[in-house]
Amino acid sequence: MNKQQLKAYFMLMRLHRPIPILLILWPTLTALVLASHGLPDISYLVIFTIGVVVMRTVGCIINDIADVDFDKHVARTNTRPLTSGQLSIKNAIWLCISLTLVAFICVLFLNLYTILLSFVALFLAILYPFCKRFFAIPQLILGLAFNFGIFMAFSAIQNQIPVEAWIFYIATICWTIAYDTIYALADREFDLETGIKSSAVLFGNKVFRYILLFNFLSLLLLIILGIYCDFNSFFYLGVVICSLFFVRNYFLYKKLGITNCINAFSANHWIGLIIFIIAVIQYI
């Protein structure tokens, strides 16, 4: 394998774009903190961090395999390894299988409940790329998939999925719908031409209102989480800071344009970091 092929595999796994990994990682780590009522054992941090990175790459590979014919016609995606012919579909499938096995080996160190949940996580990762063809809001499926690590974190530590896990899960789903709708704005014109489904297409000229609505719902659910868990004022201060980030992002993505939308999307990882920090503070 030469240097060019290694670079192609690197690009296929999206390791050059770590923001989506962080968007999955922060809620998962936060769930570990909530489930542990403090800093979790280092083994959980290692297993879940590896799992997030590996399954994110698996999702990207499945997405590229599913969308290879569409990506050829989009300027933003027509240089990807599969669409440009740098790697074959067969190469991608073998890599996907190998990485899935790595993720499964990681989860074998956890309890049976979490192992069973891992199959649901894999199903969601496979489903998302294809649901863009028939489901009006594929961002909902993405939210279910991206944040499923929350359930796995609680099941690994508590062997159950308590009420606070559900509240946090739904909050992050609303957050994901909002930020991925921003991302979808970059491709909305192409999606309209090809019939690809997305929330950016469905919401039409009211898309900005819906993004704000889902941001608001995520904040509201975080407040409910704080009340349910009897968190201190630092948690609510963090929620206020998150709301300021949402307002800042609004003025960015409202200008439209690929660069503005991608930048607004990417800035959301700071939201995840803030929530993680304020969760840790609760148990110091």
UniProtKB/Swiss-Prot annotation:
Its cofactor is Mg(2+). Its EC number is 2.5.1.39. GO terms for cellular component: plasma membrane. The keyword Transcription regulation does not apply. The chain crosses the membrane at residues 19-39, 42-62, 85-105, 107-127, 134-154, 165-185, 211-231, 233-253, 261-281. One of its GO terms (molecular function) is 4-hydroxybenzoate polyprenyltransferase activity. It catalyses: all-trans-octaprenyl diphosphate + 4-hydroxybenzoate = 4-hydroxy-3-(all-trans-octaprenyl)benzoate + diphosphate. Pathway: Cofactor biosynthesis; ubiquinone biosynthesis. Keywords: Cell inner membrane, Cell membrane, Magnesium, Membrane, Transferase, Transmembrane, Transmembrane helix, Ubiquinone biosynthesis. It is a multi-pass membrane protein. It is found in: Cell inner membrane. One of its GO terms (biological process) is ubiquinone biosynthetic process. Disulfide bonds: none annotated. InterPro entries: HB_polyprenyltransferase-like (IPR006370), Prenyltransferase (IPR039653), UbiA_prenyltransferase (IPR000537), UbiA_prenylTrfase_CS (IPR030470), UbiA_sf (IPR044878). Belongs to the UbiA prenyltransferase family. Catalyzes the prenylation of para-hydroxybenzoate (PHB) with an all-trans polyprenyl group. Mediates the second step in the final reaction sequence of ubiquinone-8 (UQ-8) biosynthesis, which is the condensation of the polyisoprenoid side chain with PHB, generating the first membrane-bound Q intermediate 3-octaprenyl-4-hydroxybenzoate. HAMAP family: UbiA. This is 4-hydroxybenzoate octaprenyltransferase. It comes from Francisella tularensis subsp. holarctica (strain OSU18).
